[in-house]
């Protein structure tokens, strides 16, 4: 997935790692700033159980009324075989993954995923490549929505920062741990947590910032992010090493 690259042009000199199709370096450094990432582990997917009209499999129930699915035809190309065409039903909660049309009360499972909401991060990559200080990095990170990443950054002026860059759903009810009834309207997403309200740090008191796919918000944070944090072993060890009394140097980190 990742490719190492060094991009040089009259207005750009940036090195790091990127992905095919990304407009520049996704994580790395230029002459002024450096940035890296770990996974936020954000839960940005919910599953909705839809009630299907027994008289019309292309309709589903929502708040007492049948709504028409949007039908999209996709062509799956298979090496050495004829292409296969499939129809996908789209609901207000997302595409239908599977259905159960047996019996008098057929149902289907729809998936609501932040990636299907047209969010993107391409502009963030471009602006990060041109940033000259942590303030400009933070401005660039406003456009980093997917995939959800913990971005740590520093500039040559000695400033450091961290921002939770992820599309964190604001759920009307529940935490998305289990499939929910799609027909009630009680479990809708009300958008995403604004950039300024996501966990972040600028020049914190300890003088360093560490992240290792661990929990990024305290218990009193008002928005649900995830249940799926990695174990604390790595972040605990990082804190132990960084809090040591011995002086840390570039050679020591190597």
Name every feature range the model reports, one short phrase each:
Residues 1-254:
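Mature extracytoplasmic enzyme cores
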